Amino acid sequence: MKAESSSMAEWHASEGLRQRYALDEAKQGDASRKESVQDELTDTKDDPAAEAMGGSPSMVLGRTPDGRLFHVIDTPDMVTSIFRLDRPKAPLDILTLVLLLWQVCLFCVLPRKQAQVFFAVYFAFWRIMYNVGLGYVLTKQSRSRWIVRMLDSSGWLDACKNPRMHAWVQYHFKTKLGASSQRIAAAPIDFQAWILFRSVVDVILLNDVTAYAFFALSNIQGLGEHGVLLFVIRWLLGLLLLAFNAWVKLDAHRVVKDYAWYWGDCFFLCLQKLKFDGVYEVAPDPMYSIGYIGYYGLSLLTGSYAVLYVSLAAHASQLLFLVLFENPHMDRVYGERVPIAARVSERRPSDVPPATGVQRSREEIRTPQLAGAASAANGSYATSERGTAAVPSPPCTNVHDLHHRLFRNDNVVLSHIDLFRSSDFLLVLCLIYALSPLVLTRCGPRALLLFATIHAVAWRLFHSFGLGFALRWQSEERWIVHHFLKHYHFADGQAAVTESFSHWKTIYNTSLIMTYVSFALLAIRSYTSWTDNIYRLRYVLGVLLILVHMWSARSSYRVLGPFGWLYGDFFIDAYPKRLSYTGIYRFLNNPERSMGSAAFFGMALLSGSLTATVVAQLAHLSHWWFLGCVEGPHMRRLYGADVRQDSGVTKQLRQLCQSQWLRAAQPSIEELQGILQRAQGVVRQLLEQSRPRLERLADDTCALLQQKAEHVLTMHTGDSVQQIDQAKYRVTPVASPHTHEQRFHVGEPIIVQWMAAENHSRRDWIGLYAVNALDAHPDEHHGSLLVTRTTSRGKWLGVAEDEWEGHVHVGLTQSPLGTHGVSSVDTDTHQVSGVSVFQGSRLPWAAPGTYELRYHHDNTHYVLAKSERFTIYADSPEDPYSFDETFMILSKILRYALVEAPSTTSAAAHEYESADKADLTLWTQDQAQHIRDGIWSAFHVDFTKDVVIASANTTLLTRDILMARQLLSR
C-alpha cells in the first residue's frame, strides 16, 4: 500500500500483527520497533478535517492511500455477528457456521484413528490458507492495493458493471453492518473492500482454530505411565496456559479493535488515539509470541507428542507470516525512512574557512597524500607526486567515520567471510580441522593413508598454485591490493597496501608451515618397517637431506630478510630494494630451485613409502613452476639487468662443459632446453588466455540467468500480429538538455516519446538495448515483424508503467496511458502518444556505449518500432590524477544517482542535512550501486558498495579514486 507523505507525517509505527503500541515520546528509536504506534496519534478531536466534515468528535477518521478522509463506520465484532442467534447472518457467516458444524459432526462420527488423520490434514489446509493464502493476498494489497483494484475491475461494487454481484455485496453489507450500512455507499472503495475481506478472514480463522482443537481432542491421552500426580500437574498447567491465551487475545482485541485485528492498515489508515497497555506491556509481538501459547496448553492437556509437533509447526508458520508479510508491511506503512549512510558533519563557524575554487568543501585546500608519505589526517602539507591541483583535506571525523573505521565488514559468526583476510582464513581453517575428527575417527588404516595423501597434496597445490597465481597477478596488476581497495575504505593508499601485505604475510606463513607439516604426517602415516640391507644408508641420507634443507632455508633467510622471504617486493614500492649476492647466493642464484625440496625427499626416504616419494616429486615440480612462472618473471620485471645470469656453481659447470668429452652431447642438451622453453611458453600463454575466457563465461552465465528472469518470449502467430500497422508506432528519445542531442551522460534520465495505435495492447513495453548485445544475438524475422533475441537486462518500461508488478502485468488500473508525462489521443489518426522516462535502475550505469530503444507488442519480444541509435557516455578526466577534474565528474554522477526517491519526506532529508556540502546521504542500496557503477564507467576503478557507503563524501570518494588509480597504475 502506498502511503502518502501526509500519512507518514502523522503515523510512525513498525513491525507487528494487529498490534500498534507507542513509540517513545523522545523518539529515541528502538531498533526493534515491533508492534508500535505513536502515542500522540492525530485524534478527530484535534483534527480540523473532522470539523470540516461535520463529524462528531467521538467519530474516528480514516484516510485512504489517495488522501481521502472519511468517517470509519462502527463494525460488530466476530463473536457478535456470527454466534449471536438474534443477529442476522450474512452469506459468509452462514458458510462459516456450516463448516464449523460439519467439523463437530465429523468429530462425533469418525473413529479416533481416522479423526486424528483427518483433522491433522484439515488443520494443515486452513493453516496454509491463513499463512500462505492471506499472506500472499495481503502482501499484494499492501504493495499495490491489489484487492481494491480487483474489486474495482470486476465491478462488484458498481451496479452498472456487475449488477448481480453488486446486489449480493450490498446485501452482505446490510446484514453485516445493520443500520450503519446506510452510510457504506458514501465510504471509499478501500473501506468497502476491507469489510468484504474481514468476512473471508473470519471463515479462515474460525475453521483454523476449530480444526486444531478437534485434532488435539482426537489425540487426548489418559493417565498413561506417569501416575496421577503428573497427570494433575499437566492438566493444571494446560488449563492455565489456555486461560492466559484467552486473556491475551481478548486484551489485544480491546486495544487494537477490529481495525488492526483484520489488517485494516493494508486498506486505509485509521486516525485515532490509542493507549497500548495490558498485554502490550507483557511481551513483544504478543499476538505472535504469547498469543499462541494455547497451542502448548492443549499439548499438555492431551499428553500427545503428535499435538506438540503440530503445534510447533503451526507456530513456526505463524512466525514466518510475521517475518515475510507483517514486518515488511509495517515498514512500508509506518517505518521511518532511515538512510543506509549519512555522513553528517557539525562545525563551528570559526572552523569554516572562506570558500575557494570549486564549492566542494568548507575546509582549506591541501595537497593529497597520494604518495603515502604521511597520513591524510595529520593536516600537514605535501606536494603531489604528479604535481596536480591542490586537494582539500578530508572533513572532520564524525559518527559515520568512526563506525566505518572500527567496523569494516568484520566477520560475525560466519557472515562477511573474506579469505583474503588472514583472520577469516585461519577461522575457516580451524573449523575444517575441528570437524575432521568426526570423519577420521571412523576411518580404517587405508582410509587414513588416503586422507593424509590428499591432505598433503592439497596444501602443496594451494601453496604453489593458489598462492602462486595470487602473487603472479599481484605482480602484474596489483591484484591483492586491488581486492582490498575494492572492498574496504582506507584513509590513504599506503594503508591499503600495508593491510593487504599484512594479511598476505600471515596466510603465506601459515601455508608454508602446513605444507611441511602435512607432508610429515603423510610420511609418518605411510611409514613401513625397513627390511632391506641399506636401511642405515637411507636413514643417514634422509636426515642429511632434511638438515641440508634447514641450512639452505636459514642461509636464504639471512640474506633475504623478512622482506624478501615474505615477497614484500610484490607489494611495497617504497622499501629499499637491491640484489645482494652474498651468503649462499654467492654460489647459487636461487637455492630453492636445487635444495628447496630436499626435506620432502628426506622424509620420503625415512618413510620408505612410494606414496610419499611420489608426493615429494609433485612438491618439487610444483615449486619449480612457482619459481619459474611467478618469482622469475617478477625478478626480471623489477630488477631487469641486475639479475645475475650465472651463479658461481654455474660458471664452474660451464667450464666443465667446454671439455671435449662433453661437446658431443651439446646439441642434444640445447635441443632439450629449447623444447623446455617452448613448453613453458605454451603453458604461460594458455594460463594467460584462460583467465579472460573464464571471466567471459561467468558474465555470460550471469546474463543468461538474468534473461530467464525477464520476459519470456511469447510466440504468437496469426493475423492478430501480422496485421498490425507498424506505421502507427514510433519510439524516440528526447535530446538531452545538456548536450542538445541524443547523447546522454551515464545516469542521466532518458525521456522517451512513444506513439502507438489507439487500440494497442496495454501490455506493450519499451526496452533499452546495447547495440553490441543486439549484434551478438541477431534478430529473428517472423513474417514482417522482428523478434528481439537478447535480454534488456532489466532496462525496460511498460507504456502503462503503473499497471506492472515486476515482470507481471496486473492490468487492472484503467488510468490514462503513459507513465511520466501526459498522454494524448489523436482521433484523426487513431493514435495515442505518451512519455516514459528511463531513470535510476532502468539505466545502464556500468556500460556506456551505443544503445537503441525498441517498442514491443503485448508483453512479447515482437518489435513494432525502433529508435535511432544514440550514445550513453561517461566523462573521463584528461589528467587521470587531477583532483578537480575527478571531483567535477564524480559530482555529476552523484547528482544523477542521488535523485531523491518519491517516498523521501522533506523532514527526513532535513534531519540528515550536513554542514559539509560534500557529505552524502544514501537512502538505498540501489543508490550506492549506481555510484559504484558510475565510478567504474568514468574512471575504471572498481569499488564495492561498501566502500561508497563508508566514504559517503564527495571529497573522500575523489581521494579514493585517485589513490586507487595511482596504486594500480603500475
Swiss-Prot record:
Pfam family, one: PEMT
Lumenal face residues: 1-89, 138-199, 249-281, 326-424, 468-503, 554-594
InterPro entries: Phopholipid_MeTrfase (IPR007318), Phosphatid-EA_MeTrfase_fun (IPR016219)
Start-end of Basic and acidic residues biased regions: 24-48
Region (Disordered): 24-59
Any Gene Ontology biological process: phosphatidylcholine biosynthetic process
GO cellular component: endoplasmic reticulum membrane
Catalytic activity: a 1,2-diacyl-sn-glycero-3-phosphoethanolamine + S-adenosyl-L-methionine = a 1,2-diacyl-sn-glycero-3-phospho-N-methylethanolamine + S-adenosyl-L-homocysteine + H(+)
Molecular function terms from GO: phosphatidylethanolamine N-methyltransferase activity
Side Cytoplasmic, residues: 111-116, 221-227, 303-304, 446, 525-533, 616-970
Disulfide bonding pattern of the chain: none
Alphabetical keyword list: Endoplasmic reticulum, Lipid biosynthesis, Lipid metabolism, Membrane, Methyltransferase, Phospholipid biosynthesis, Phospholipid metabolism, S-adenosyl-L-methionine, Transferase, Transmembrane, Transmembrane helix
Domain of life from the UniProt record: Eukaryota
Major place of residence: endoplasmic reticulum
Family note: Belongs to the class VI-like SAM-binding methyltransferase superfamily. CHO2 family.
Protein name: Phosphatidylethanolamine N-methyltransferase
Organism from which the protein derives: Malassezia globosa (strain ATCC MYA-4612 / CBS 7966) (Dandruff-associated fungus)
Lineage: Eukaryota, Fungi, Dikarya, Basidiomycota, Ustilaginomycotina
The encoding gene: CHO2
